């Protein structure tokens, strides 16, 4: 599965075109709705796993969030991601989800 996101210059300050990226999975956001960022029940495409964080696409932009607490810095907004589809052979998203499930 592919998605199109903006391509930025080296400094990351200006959009210089578009780029096609591979979608490696999908997560559902469960929690408080913030109209500018998250909607309860919405499914987001994941394009990268970086440590304990995932890069998700929201409409056309991509954002990096901590998997276990994506709303950590937002006052009054609480939520989490649940893996809906993991397209990776290594099941990277499922392993990340299980890592936090086992720690609670």
Tell me the role of every PLM-derived stretch:
Residues 1-32:
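Mixed-charge, Lys/Arg-rich low-complexity intrinsically disordered regions
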Residues 10-11, 98-104:
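Mixed-charge, low-complexity intrinsically disordered regions
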Residues 2, 26-74:
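Basic/aromatic-rich interaction segments and small domains that mediate binding to polyanionic partners
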Residues 1-2, 13, 18, 54, ...:
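Intrinsically disordered, low-complexity regions
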Residues 63-100:
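Intrinsically disordered, low-complexity, charged/polar segments
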Residues 17-19, 45, 55, 59, ...:
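Exposed, low-complexity/repetitive linear segments and helix-based recognition motifs
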Residues 10-11, 19-22, 48, 61, ...:
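Glutamate identity and glutamate-enriched acidic tracts
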Residues 13, 21, 27, 44, ...:
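Short glycine-aromatic motifs
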């Amino acid at each position: 599965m592919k998605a199109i996101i903006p391509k930025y210059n080296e400094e990351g300050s200006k959009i210089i075109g578009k780029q096609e990226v591979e979608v490696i999975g999908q997560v559902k956001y469960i929690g408080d709705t913030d109209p500018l960022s998250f909607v309860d029940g919405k499914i987001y495409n994941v394009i990268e796993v970086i440590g304990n964080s995932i890069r998700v696409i929201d409409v056309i932009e991509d954002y990096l969030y901590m998997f276990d607490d994506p709303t950590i810095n937002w006052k009054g907004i609480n939520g989490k991601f649940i893996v809906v589809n993991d397209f990776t052979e290594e099941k990277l998203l499922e392993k990340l989800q299980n890592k936090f499930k086992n720690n609670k």
